[in-house]
């Protein structure tokens, strides 16, 4: 249940991965179907140590999802740029303007109307999680329903939410990659989760997704008065981009260290009231960061 399983996955992809062309034009080495299991019960959180992971960015992203927002402006205000490439690409394609990412983000911050027009990602994660538009005209808050079920009927096998709204995929900047989250409560009150990720960028995306999923599980357990159990991650198309192969080999050569600990320092009444300051991470001792370009 340690970082070694991530490194084994990397090794398997490098050794056995199918060479594939993809929509980004970069190309990948890909395996189909993978699983990892992480024990969160002792306060450990799966933040990789074989390279430094900017875990606060991943937690800020999860808090943004939970807010229901779909505009990058709140992220950019916090110094989070992980979603800026997609609206920037749309802006450049539609206007012909050759702004840098830094210049684009500066305009997002300085101009409310510009941010409203060009900073929105469409009906992505937060919209589907908190305001799913049903065919009956009703709006469904999947997160609120999940928390209520965790409290009132913890033995339910229907405790899940997802973002794959087929009717709105065409309007999303990027269809959901981490798309289904399912939850399970043991008879002794431990919350387990299973995340299904249809598409996993193993070098850049997956380390963030693991942090986000663990942070979400901690918040849900806190809201429902439960202890933490296992986080199970499953992937569909699990891939390494060709321009990340050297970085992955460098990471494989490093010896993993113990995962850090996560403690929630405050216990708000609502899942939308958590702040980044509520997440105390201790004992994180990673190897140096390894850089890699995002495939858009």
UniProtKB/Swiss-Prot annotation:
CDD domains: TS_Pyrimidine_HMase. The gene is thyA. It is found in: Cytoplasm. (6R)-5,10-methylene-5,6,7,8-tetrahydrofolate binds at residues 201, 295. Pfam families: Thymidylat_synt (PF00303). Pathway: Pyrimidine metabolism; dTTP biosynthesis. This is Thymidylate synthase. The lineage of its organism: Bacteria, Pseudomonadati, Pseudomonadota, Alphaproteobacteria, Sphingomonadales. It comes from Zymomonas mobilis subsp. mobilis (strain ATCC 31821 / ZM4 / CP4). It comes from the Bacteria. It catalyses: dUMP + (6R)-5,10-methylene-5,6,7,8-tetrahydrofolate = 7,8-dihydrofolate + dTMP. The keyword Methyltransferase applies. Its EC number is 2.1.1.45.
């Amino acid at each position: 249940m340690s970082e070694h399983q991530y490194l084994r996955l990397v090794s398997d992809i490098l050794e056995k991965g199918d060479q594939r062309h993809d929509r980004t034009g970069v190309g990948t080495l890909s395996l189909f179907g993978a699983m990892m299991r992480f024990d969160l019960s002792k306060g450990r959180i799966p933040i990789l140590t074989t390279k430094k992971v900017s875990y606060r960015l991943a937690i800020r992203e999860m808090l943004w999802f939970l807010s229901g927002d779909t505009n990058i402006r709140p992220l950019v205000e916090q110094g989070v740029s992980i979603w800026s490439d997609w609206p920037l690409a749309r802006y450049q394609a539609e206007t012909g303007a050759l702004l840098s990412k830094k210049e684009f983000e500066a305009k997002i911050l300085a101009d409310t109307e510009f941010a409203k027009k060009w900073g929105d990602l469409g009906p992505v994660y937060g919209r589907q999680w908190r305001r799913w538009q049903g065919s009956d005209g009703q709006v469904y808050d999947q997160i609120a329903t999940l928390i209520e079920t965790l409290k009132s009927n913890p033995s339910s096998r229907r405790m899940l939410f997802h973002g794959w709204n087929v009717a709105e995929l065409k309007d999303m900047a990027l269809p959901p990659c981490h798309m289904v989250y399912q939850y399970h409560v043991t008879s002794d009150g431990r919350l387990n989760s299973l995340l299904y990720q249809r598409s996993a960028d193993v070098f850049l995306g997956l380390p963030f997704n693991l942090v986000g999923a663990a942070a979400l599980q901690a918040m849900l357990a806190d809201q429902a008065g439960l202890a933490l159990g296992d986080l199970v991650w499953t992937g569909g198309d699990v891939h390494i981009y060709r321009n990340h192969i050297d970085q992955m080999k460098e990471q494989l050569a490093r010896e993993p260290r113990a995962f850090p600990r996560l403690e929630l320092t405050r216990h708000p009444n609502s899942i939308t009231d958590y702040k980044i300051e509520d997440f105390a991470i201790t004992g994180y001792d990673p190897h140096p960061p390894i850089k890699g370009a995002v495939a858009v």
